[in-house]
UniProtKB/Swiss-Prot annotation:
Positions of the GST C-terminal domain: 86-207
Task performed by this protein: Conjugation of reduced glutathione to a wide number of exogenous and endogenous hydrophobic electrophiles.
Upper classification of the organism: Eukaryota, Metazoa, Ecdysozoa, Arthropoda, Hexapoda
Protein name from the UniProt record: Glutathione S-transferase 1
One MF annotation (Gene Ontology) recorded for this entry: glutathione transferase activity
Residues reported to bind glutathione: S9, H50, T51, I52, E64, S65, R66
Organism whose genome encodes this protein: Musca domestica (House fly)
Enzyme class: transferase
CDD domains (UniProt xref): GST_C_Delta_Epsilon, GST_N_Delta_Epsilon
Catalysed conversion reaction: RX + glutathione = an S-substituted glutathione + a halide anion + H(+)
Amino acid sequence: MDFYYLPGSAPCRSVLMTAKALGIELNKKLLNLQAGEHLKPEFLKINPQHTIPTLVDGDFALWESRAIMVYLVEKYGKTDSLFPKCPKKRAVINQRLYFDMGTLYKSFADYYYPQIFAKAPADPELFKKIETAFDFLNTFLKGHEYAAGDSLTVADLALLASVSTFEVASFDFSKYPNVAKWYANLKTVAPGWEENWAGCLEFKKYFG
């Protein structure tokens, strides 16, 4: 399977950790966005939205990291532990995935990206949205070792990619004890943590 990615990208890292958990070897293809490689005709044929990560499995192409994660588990998982078939368990996992995409990671992008890529000043109102997102995550994790129940799922891997990116941005987790405890545990149990952290350090270079 071909996997178009950037090591520093949190969505790409979440897929890499999922593949590691499944024992899948991906044929990694580094895409240089600054050089416009994602806009070349050959890549646009694969993904007209020209985004990363993008997975090509035979004649099937898929993008959006959380969709890729679920696809890999459903097609290649020897068990359903990362994305259980139980409708209620799966619904909670989906909620966490959508929360990561639409609230937590979005708060990172909205606050930090203008500072990194447009040299804009920090917006305190957008920082409040980060704090709100972490308040929610802290509540979700109350009484739970993992993000969507009592075992590791794709929700944890997606959230881990995001939260670790906040760490290299020097965000202080100390006000969120449940998040801090979960994060410390995930660093030890998540497959592919080392590669994820190496990617975080790549991304950290943007902060100067």
